[in-house]
Amino acid sequence: MLIGFSQVYAQTVSGTVQSATDKSGLPGASVVMKRAASDAILTTSTDVQGAFRFERVPSGNYTLEVRYLGYDLLSRPVQVAQAPVVLGVLSMQEQNTRLGEVQIIGRAPLGEQKGDTSQFNAKAFKTAPDASAEDLVTKMPGVQVQDGRIQAQGEEVRQIMIDGKRYTGEDVTSAMRNISSDMIENVQVFDAQSDQAAFSGFEDGNRLKTINFITRKDRRQGYTGKISAGYGTDERYMAGAAINYFNNDRRITVTGLTNNINMFDFSIGETPGGGMRGRRGGWGGGSPTGIINTNNFGVNYQDKWGKKMDVSANYNYTNRDIVNDQYRFRDFVSDEAGLQYTEDSNNRDREDGHRLNMRLQYNINQNNRLLVTPNLRVQNDESFTGRNARTFDLNGTLSESLNRASSDNTTFNFNNNILYSKRFGDSGRILTTNFNTSINNVDGDGFQYEQTQNFENADNNVLRDQFIRLDRKNFSWSGSTNYSQRLGEKSRWQLEYSIGNQMRDSDRRTYDYVETAGEYADFNMPLSSSFKSDYLSQSVGPSYQYRNDKTRLQVNARYEYAVLDTDSQFPVDLDPLKRKFSNFLPSAEYEFKFSQSQNLTLNLRTNTNVPSVEQLQEVLDISNPLQARIGNADLEQDYQTRFNARYRNFNAETNRVFFIGMFGTMTNNYVANSVYTTSAPEGLAEGYEFRPGARLSRPENMDGYYNVRSFFNYGQPLNFISSNFNVNGSVGYSRIPGKIDGQVNYSNNTNLGAGFNISSNISEKIDFTVSTFSSYNIVSNTLRTTQNNNFFNQNTSLRYNWILWKDLVYRTELNHQYNSGLSAGVDNSFLLWNMSLGKKIFKDKQGEISLSVNDLMNQNVSIRRNITESYVEDVQSTVLQRFFMLTFSYNIRSFKGAPAPDENMQRGPGMHRGGRPGMN
């Protein structure tokens, strides 16, 4: 009775938070409602205009508290009765401490922890005047670049927001490179809910690590961007531009790039040739592999159509030509001592693709919302690989293979998701429905030529010349319905039903070259396959959620029933195979807030995965004849359990930050590789003759896969050198099951890593970052226990920007990599040194002419170690080496009501004068 009475009188509470000084809205402010008679608490944050809204607030007396960096706490009582509460404008007073006529000036606060959101004050991290958002965030605690990708708190950043609105598109790094750092007031790092979870209010396990950039109020109307062009030695060239237009809700970004210096996208914070930020790093830093010519054009659009429609879209065209030579060394896990494999290959790839992503959200009314997110990708790939490979043991060479392979494939991918949510007034009931469709087709052809010499028996030498035709069609759809109901002030329950269907049809036909006919006319049945699969899954189950001011708990229990139908017509016409699966899929999430600055989150999820058509299709792939592969139509779905634990502590008074996290995965029925080295079971690979030292791999379900890793970061200011200091470390362990000639092998890899980072906070004229990270890997196998593949890797880097006398700008970047324990023939260490000297020109200093050098020492290399259940390999690839380039760049900065660019360079080192942090 009491619960029902409370629900009847649940109301909305809304208002707008503004600065008392200039009446501007304060975005990202923390708004909390505490109930006077209990420990119940409600939290939210303001949008880009400073507005906030609480839904379904039970009647009673509350205390409303608003917090914002650089402002005094605002607190006021609020009474909720039988009508919506409109608080109107809430004005916050700036913090401004004076002693007589002497103003107290201190270091800008680093930020604060707001629940599970880490918020950083951008002005507490000094960057160069023309820096990008990427340059800014990589100075912040827990944020780093790993293998060319941005990571935050140990996880890859998967989504970018600007003032709380999602940046539509697939490339997170590109988005950050096109936002100037001087536009940003605060940076928020958090795990964003999926659209489904945000609409329903229940977690679905699909959170994405997200960075939200809250822009300065004087940077929301105007233009920003950069135009650059350069030419250098060895006919190296680059021309690119990025232009951003901002008019409050409307935001348009246009980018273009053409170059042959391995830049994949344009960055407004980079001087091409003298920096690496426009490129994608390889293992341990360094350049991307190969010599890459890229032509790229993109448009990003975001707007609000009327009062109810939010629209965003992203279009990208990319044309890329890649030339890459590689050396590969493999040390096999085998009963044959010293069995190894080497390969020299030259690779040529041409890519031509279009991508279109859209997001349309229609807020029909207060209780109904509709979200449509279509995505389209069309791509053509042409590739050529020439490979010279050999296998050998302690007695010498066993076989040598020369083969060439070329292909021309066109991929069409379309995905559309429709999400609808309905709230039944203030009753607390919510209905959410979701429907998704996906089409993924691949159409292409290719040629393969092989000449293999058998050193044990010349009669078994192989000469092969073939044409291959591929036609693959995949169509899938899925839908779900969720109904949730409030049980009281602190708890809710939900019932969910979902259904999905994946239909895949793969047809691969191989023809041998007939010398007398002069064409590819002889159909090769063993190397051809026609295969279909149909996977239908359904699940149903309840969820329960409880929350108060300190605790959030959610538990889910789903029952899943699935059917997998497969049908193979050739190489062997098999009867259709039907397999049925039933699983119990529990999940749970727990969060405890020790205080506003400390919280702990625990998460457990389970799910199943169906094998891919490539894994199911029993067709022999001998594109690399010494490393052949074949599918397995008897594969079953795997069962995966994932868990993670995170603890965050952000002390705003001392500016000390601490994160620690643990992430783990355990998989039953893991799709492992079963490797055959001498002969395969009868009928498995008809028509294939084993070359000496060759291997045939086939997927097989096995238990015993584990992957556990942990990460920590501690950061604090070093005031005596006006810098920020971060120390981080990691511990990881993985166990990968597999089979070698029927014997079970577990590949165990333990990884230990530690490093530190010091980034300057002196002024915009001096900007440096020094970092180092070392890792040691212990690799062991249960079959070959004497094999030692342990290795050590250390990467140390320095980035330094200095605005000298008379507007001269010096930039340098050093990256040193040291490796120990790699195979012979692979470079153990290198020093990559990029440098530029530029001169600011024009009255407003927005132009620059610079002379830069890439890889001054001409030592750059790319090295990668891969660890599997059947071998350990080292790969060294072609990289771009030394060249010089003369570049002209022009920075575009024009904002309504903003100070001139040179005025922005006059702020002191990490200081602010009252008011909002870092603002004059």
Model-inferred region functions:
Residues 116, 264-282, 325-342, 390-401, ...:
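Surface-exposed loop/turn segments flanking beta-strands in extracellular/periplasmic regions
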Residues 16-26:
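Structural motif
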Residues 36-51:
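Short, acidic Ser/Thr/Gly-rich low-complexity loop/linker segments typical of extracellular
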Residues 34-39, 61-77:
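A short, solvent-exposed loop/turn motif at the edges and junctions
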